[in-house]
């Protein structure tokens, strides 16, 4: 009813490798849900539903792969434009992750200096949705604690043995954040893991 003709919803087996785990898989729901939707939503047959397999984890190959997908669906387009857009997207992703890391460390330092409790709030990307997290981050802050995310501290930890097959990107972040928090045992820093839908 809204005139949508194209839906781009790629399957992505792998996440960007953060060098924390034995592998860097996306969970099966994230990776393959487009297949489930394509097979079960008949209306999609009337649209250009693009659920090709794509890998963000290999920047050197990404431009060629997305270029092929776009040309196949939309005809001739400029590889240089696709490559330029891809490079800018990766640059922005890395800049964004640096900002999260720096802001988290800024809040952590300020809280420790002011003897405030800190909660490293671990969750999956969908926990950013207030309909799913129910404002738990705000509630924790209202109780007087500073909240930072697991991806703000996980880069401070090198890969380490976990005793499990550590192949999921978000679990790797969780383990790294927990290890970092454990190093701060003399500080009032704790970790809370959000779990929804039976994930994890």
Residue ranges and their predicted role:
Residues 1-200:
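An N-terminal assembly and electron-transfer interface module characteristic of large anaerobic redox
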